[in-house]
């Protein structure tokens, strides 16, 4: 385990990075290097689910019990 014992401590660097971005009023979920990919995936899933449920609810209100057919 000498690699683990002699590993450099990167916490102060990352802490400075996050604190600097936070001082510039950047939202926490937009600071990280992968945040764009994560937020894009989340937004697609969230709005896709919302749209699908609104579509299904409107079909149910109109009296159709299936997604596509007129039955």
Curated annotation (Swiss-Prot):
| GO cellular component assignments | mitochondrial inner membrane
Q: How does it sit in the bilayer?
A: Single-pass membrane protein
Subcellular location as annotated: Mitochondrion inner membrane
Q: Name one Pfam family in it.
A: COX7a
Assembly mode: Component of the cytochrome c oxidase (complex IV, CIV), a multisubunit enzyme composed of 11 subunits. The complex is composed of a catalytic core of 3 subunits Cox1, Cox2 and Cox3, encoded in the mitochondrial DNA, and 8 supernumerary subunits Cox4, Cox5a/Cox5, Cox6, Cox7, Cox8, Cox7a/Cox9, Cox6b/Cox12 and Cox6a/Cox13, which are encoded in the nuclear genome.
Give the similarity note. Answer: Belongs to the cytochrome c oxidase VIIa family.
What pathway does this protein act in? Energy metabolism; oxidative phosphorylation
Highest rank taxon of the organism = Eukaryota
Keyword list, A-Z = Membrane, Mitochondrion, Mitochondrion inner membrane, Transmembrane, Transmembrane helix
- Single GO biological process annotation from the record: oxidative phosphorylation
Primary site of residence: mitochondrion
Task of the protein: Component of the cytochrome c oxidase, the last enzyme in the mitochondrial electron transport chain which drives oxidative phosphorylation. The respiratory chain contains 3 multisubunit complexes succinate dehydrogenase (complex II, CII), ubiquinol-cytochrome c oxidoreductase (cytochrome b-c1 complex, complex III, CIII) and cytochrome c oxidase (complex IV, CIV), that cooperate to transfer electrons derived from NADH and succinate to molecular oxygen, creating an electrochemical gradient over the inner membrane that drives transmembrane transport and the ATP synthase.
Mitochondrial intermembrane-facing ranges: 59-71
Q: By its UniProt entry, which InterPro entries does this protein fall under?
A: COX7a
Record's protein name:
Cytochrome c oxidase subunit 7, mitochondrial
- Residues exposed to the Mitochondrial matrix side: 1-35
- Organism of this sequence: Neurospora crassa (strain ATCC 24698 / 74-OR23-1A / CBS 708.71 / DSM 1257 / FGSC 987)
Transmembrane parts of this sequence: 36-58
